[in-house]
Amino acid sequence: MTDLPPHALQPAEPVSVEQHMALSSLFTTLEDLTAWSRKHSLWPFNFGLSCCYVEQVTALTPVYDQARFGAEVIRASPRQADLLVVSGTVFHKMAAPLLRLYEQMRAPRWVIAMGACACSGGMYDIYSVVQGVDRFIPVDVYIPGCPPRPEAMLDALIMLQQQVGSERRPLGVTVGNSAGLGFDAPRRRDERHDQRMAQTLLDPPETL
């Protein structure tokens, strides 16, 4: 027979109904529950342009384990993502495609600018480089450095999670008129359908 301490042989004290409810029930509001779920289930879409992207993907390795923060599901399409991570030098040629990718993301959406080039243009103060990605899309968290370490990416995720968890959005953002998930805003695909179908000439690449 295994030797047990004397208190282990004593019968457990009965648990009251109030104590049982406190241990097994959760009381919250829909806004708080929505913010909590968004905070711990960010779906990033990586837009890597240069050396900072190497440090960004390093944060996904087992050494740093970005999965601890619920942001390891890298999406291949911006339509399935709510977090855009821009890392590297943003040239003017890439500004228009990057803006289109941002517009394709479903709201609510957030942006992280990783590296000095994405934050402010870095050392490239020249005509061909955008001096900060916030010139044409809003940025929520900036990660300075050339390049920043993977730990900085994890710190940015923590800061963004705190920001997302503190946001309180109206119920209409979560539950539409038909009680289904989604937004009541019209889709850009539907808005531009007639215009795209009537277009017969394509713009040259240098005008984009």
Curated annotation (Swiss-Prot):
Transmembrane segments: none annotated. This is NADH-quinone oxidoreductase subunit B. Keywords: 4Fe-4S, Cell inner membrane, Cell membrane, Iron, Iron-sulfur, Membrane, Metal-binding, NAD, Quinone, Translocase, Transport, Ubiquinone. GO terms for cellular component: plasma membrane; respiratory chain complex I. Residues 180-208 are annotated as: Disordered. NDH-1 is composed of 14 different subunits. Subunits NuoB, C, D, E, F, and G constitute the peripheral sector of the complex. Gene3D superfamilies: 3.40.50.12280. The gene is nuoB. Signal peptide: none annotated. It comes from Rhodopseudomonas palustris (strain HaA2). It is found in: Cell inner membrane. GO terms for biological process: aerobic respiration; electron transport coupled proton transport.
